[in-house]
Amino acid sequence: MNFPKQVPSKMPVHRYEAFHPIDLPDRTWPNKKITKAPQWCSVDLRDGNQALIDPMDTPRKLAMFKLLVAMGYKEIEVGFPSASQTDFDFVRKIIEEKLIPDDVVIQVLTQAREALIVRTFESIKGSKQAIVHLYNSTSTLQRRVVFGLDKDGIKKIATDAAKICLDLVKTVPETKVSFEYSPESYTGTELEFAVEVCNAVNDVWKPTPQWKTIMNLPATVEMATPNVYADSIEWMCRNLNNRESVIVSLHPHNDRGTGVAAAELGYLAGADRIEGTLFGNGERTGNVCLVTLGINLVTHGIDPHIDFSNIDEVRRTVEYANQLRVPERHPYGGDLVFTAFSGSHQDAIKKGFDHMAVDAKAAGKEVRDHTWAIPYLPIDPLDIGRSYEAVIRVNSQSGKGGVAYLMKNEHHLDLPRRLQIEFSKNIQAKTDSEGGEISPEDLWNIFEDEYLPTEGAPWGRFRLKGLSQTSVLGEDVHLIVSLTDRGQVHELKGQGNGPSAAFCNILQNYGVDVRVLDYYEHALSAGGDASAAAYLECSIEGETFWGVGIDPNTTTASLKAVVSAINRAIR
């Protein structure tokens, strides 16, 4: 086959320049493996909040703050107190009302201007511990078009502000203050200049292994592939002075859609800490998603040190606080992320669950304690508070596996394989003709209409009204049935080597050519009063039909299944 050749587009690519790669031929991060969780910092209440159409009011901020604390985040950027009275008041509120646990450190952001730094220190008075996060932009573009300053001018802004921060520590003697510095627009800054500014700031602050500073390296705008960001982080880790006294922090954004990858590769490259938001809210395309990063660790058997066991509650709180919906396809938290519509996917998932149950039993373990290994599901939904209810849903792309899964899990009917195939054709015909999705309730209604006539929706020529049987060990069963034929009740007798065989002989004598080809049954629930489901594959007038019967008595259930098959054949 000759594949068609792609042709040039009309996109104005001449207006854009490729990002220059970093010369790091001896990079080591590709050969490393993540083995533990990073130091996390949530910036939902600052970076996330400033990106909202309707910024959070105090109740929404409190809900978010309490959620973050409950989940286990120990560093929380709670605002930009010099930027708005609302942020300042919120910082004061959580301090004065003693809402900050002793093991949680609040973080506050400030620009590199004296008046703003002073206001920031005023906001943290009375707190037990706080991180003052200082930033100024260092990128080549902003130096030229925003500040009109050379490198020395930009570096002086940073070091002057660092000195002011250091001097103001004495104004909050009751607070253990730590410092963080961000060369904002780091990804647009020459690495040599970025490390020069960071080292100059640290020369002012003079960190020690006992009192570390945080050097935060933000992808304020994501400008290249994640491997380039990782190269830059490894280069910085090699060239930062006094590295043992510095916490290297990442702050990826998602402009190119690879924020999570950038964070994970940057962490491999030597970073210690990651800043982000729950579900990735933030400026433009958002910050890196802490939910995705954290649960990614869980799927590799690494404790994230964060509690994601009730992801729906996390999502509800985040949606309330942000007034933004979490998309259906957002990793781990979206409504559809554990849902399979594809027939082949559904079949694989169903078989995976069946196989895992067998493996767990063989290992002497409960299924919930056994190693998770289900096709298409990287994590057990139950482990993050989701259910299996939405794992498989039925539409026109679904196959027998999905139909069988729902019938078993929603309606407790474990359909034999050939019956799965037969019934799925009915579902396929309905979805093809009507479109859309079929709910578990719809599925049951279709199944009843096809196999199980009820008092409310009767159909079929025959109905079994009653039966009695007698048998002696080693001899045929003698059966008497009350059979309704088009409303007329007939008492019929016969015998055979079992109840089903006796019933078929009775029907043969009545003029219905029926033979049982295969038979399955199971209890619908545990206990002495459980009903039984019987599935019989029958040959009727030379054609094959399945019948289904449900009854507290297993014999009655099997005879009902024969009647079901006959009624379907002549319907």
Task: Locate each region found by the language model.
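Short, small-residue-enriched loops and turns at beta-alpha junctions
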Residues: 47, 51-52, 81-85, 139-141, ...
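Alpha/beta enzyme core
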Residues: 6-9, 14-16, 40, 56-75, ...
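A mid-to-C-terminal "edge-of-domain" accessory segment
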Residues: 2-46, 301-493, 528-531
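Catalytic alpha/beta core domains of metabolic enzymes, predominantly
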Residues: 224-359
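Mixed-charge, glycine-accented linear interaction segment located at domain edges/termini
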Residues: 544-546, 550-571
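A conserved regulatory-domain signal marking ACT and ACT-like small-molecule sensing domains
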Residues: 467-477, 486-488, 493-546, 552-553
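Short beta-alpha connecting loops at secondary-structure transitions
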Residues: 103, 142-145, 217-219, 247, ...
